Amino acid sequence: MADRNLRDLLAPWVPDAPSRALREMTLDSRVAAAGDLFVAVVGHQADGRRYIPQAIAQGVAAIIAEAKDEATDGEIREMHGVPVIYLSQLNERLSALAGRFYHEPSDNLRLVGVTGTNGKTTTTQLLAQWSQLLGEPSAVMGTVGNGLLGKVIPTENTTGSAVDVQHELAGLVDQGATFCAMEVSSHGLVQHRVAALKFAASVFTNLSRDHLDYHGDMEHYEAAKWLLYSAHHCGQAIINADDEVGRRWLAKLPDAVAVSMEDHINPNCHGRWLKATDVNYHDSGATIRFSSSWGDGEIESRLMGAFNVSNLLLALATLLALGYPLADLLKTAARLQPVCGRMEVFTAPGKPTVVVDYAHTPDALEKALQAARLHCAGKLWCVFGCGGDRDKGKRPLMGAIAEEFADVAVVTDDNPRTEEPRAIINDILAGMLDAGYAKVMEGRAEAVTCAVMQAKENDVVLVAGKGHEDYQIVGNQRLDYSDRVTVARLLGVIA
C-alpha cells in the first residue's frame, strides 16, 4: 500500500472500493485538503457527516463515513464525483484503518503501553530514557507531549485520536525510533483510540479516584483500564501487585510479571516477578535493593518518594521481560533523570526545598506529600487547588489529605475553567476538620510566592497539581502560567 490507495486501504472491509490515490487522512474537515481522505465519524459532541460538503469543497479525494442511520455497511456512494464509503461502527474500526494507512507503525518498533491513574508519565519517561541509554532511539507519547527524547512536542490529550496515534507513531518510525513508551488513558481505551496497536508490553501502575465525571463510578473506571489487557494486543503484561486492582488482575493473568515493593509477591505463585527487598531514602533520592526472576541487584535512584520507586521497578521489570540484560540495566540506572514536573526538586542556598508535582487526585496528593515528608527536616507545606468543571467529589478528599499530611496547607486555584474559583476552594475546605487551618489565596502565583517566601530553609514546599503545564485555564482563556517558572524565579535558579 505504498501509494496509499483507497482500494488497498479498504480491501479487508470493502473489496470493491474504487481506486483513488490518497495524500493524508484526517477527521477534521477544517484541515482537509486536496487529495486527502476525510473520515466522518459520529463523536460525542459532533456528527462528522455534517461536514462532508465542506470536505468535498476543499478537494478531498475520498470520504469514509459512519453508516449508522445513513447507509448499509460497505455501501459506496458518490457525491460531486467523490466516492463516499460507509462503514458501520467506524469509531471501533478507525485504529485499524489508520494503521493500514500509515503502514502499521506499531509493527516496526517496540511499543510499550502504560495505563493507571498515577505514574504513567514517570514510568513512560523512565522506560524511554533507559532503552535509549542502552542504544535504542527512543520516544514517548503522553501527557507531556509526543516525540523522540529531547524533541518532545506538547500535546492536548494524554491519548490522541485513533488517527493521531497512528500518524504520530508513523512519524516516530520515520525519524528512526525503535522504542516508544506510550501513556494509555482510560478515555483512549473506551474510545478505541489504540484498538489496533500491537504492544510489546503493557504496564499497569495503579488505580485510584479520577475521571469519575466521565466514567461514573470506580467499577466502570476499572473496566476501562482492564480493556488494555482484555481487548487489545497487550504483549507482556507488567502489573503492580501493591495495588488492590493489580492483585485482582494478576489472578486473571497467569503469565503476567508481578511487581511489588510491599511484599505482595510469593515467588512460588508468580511465574515472573520483581520485588524490592530494601529501600533507603536519602536527600538525593533512594537506594533500592531488589530480587527478581532475572536476578538480584541494587539501584541508586535520583527520584523522590516511594511511588517513584514503584514506577522505576515497573520500568525495570518491563525491560527485563522484553529481554534487556539485567547487567546492562544496572550499569545505566544511575543515569536516569527525574521527570519534568514530576516530584521535581528546586533548591537554592538559604531557601526552602520546593517540589513541583502534577498530583491532582487524592491518591497522588497523599503519595506526593508522603514522599516529600521523607526528605523534610522542618515543616511540610502544600500549595494546591482543584480543576473546575471536573469531578467535584475529589475536592473535599484532597482537602482532608492536605490537612492530615501537610503542616501548612495553602489552598488556591488550579484550572478553575468556567467555575467560580472561590466555590472550588470552599469545596476543598469542606473536607477539612478545621477549615481555619488552611491559608486561602486565589491567585496561584501569589499563593506559591507566599509559601516559598514564608517557608524556612529546612522546610519543604510541595506545589501540586500542574507539574509540567505552562498554562492556566480561567474561564475559556488559556493564560501563560508555570509553577516551575514561578518557583525557579523565586529561588533564583533556572527551570
Curated annotation (Swiss-Prot):
Positions with a binding annotation for ATP: G116, T117, N118, G119, K120, T121, T122
Reactions performed catalytically: UDP-N-acetyl-alpha-D-muramoyl-L-alanyl-D-glutamate + meso-2,6-diaminopimelate + ATP = UDP-N-acetyl-alpha-D-muramoyl-L-alanyl-gamma-D-glutamyl-meso-2,6-diaminopimelate + ADP + phosphate + H(+)
Pathway: Cell wall biogenesis; peptidoglycan biosynthesis
Gene Ontology biological process terms from the UniProt entry: cell division; cell wall organization; peptidoglycan biosynthetic process; regulation of cell shape
Name of the protein in question: UDP-N-acetylmuramoyl-L-alanyl-D-glutamate--2,6-diaminopimelate ligase
NCBIfam families per the UniProt record, alphabetical: murE (TIGR01085), PRK00139.1-1 (NF001123), PRK00139.1-2 (NF001124), PRK00139.1-4 (NF001126)
In-chain residues carrying the UniProt-annotated modification N6-carboxylysine: K225
The entry's keywords: ATP-binding, Cell cycle, Cell division, Cell shape, Cell wall biogenesis/degradation, Cytoplasm, Ligase, Magnesium, Nucleotide-binding, Peptidoglycan synthesis
SUPFAM superfamilies noted in UniProt: MurD-like peptide ligases, catalytic domain, MurD-like peptide ligases, peptide-binding domain, MurE/MurF N-terminal domain
Key word DNA-binding present: no
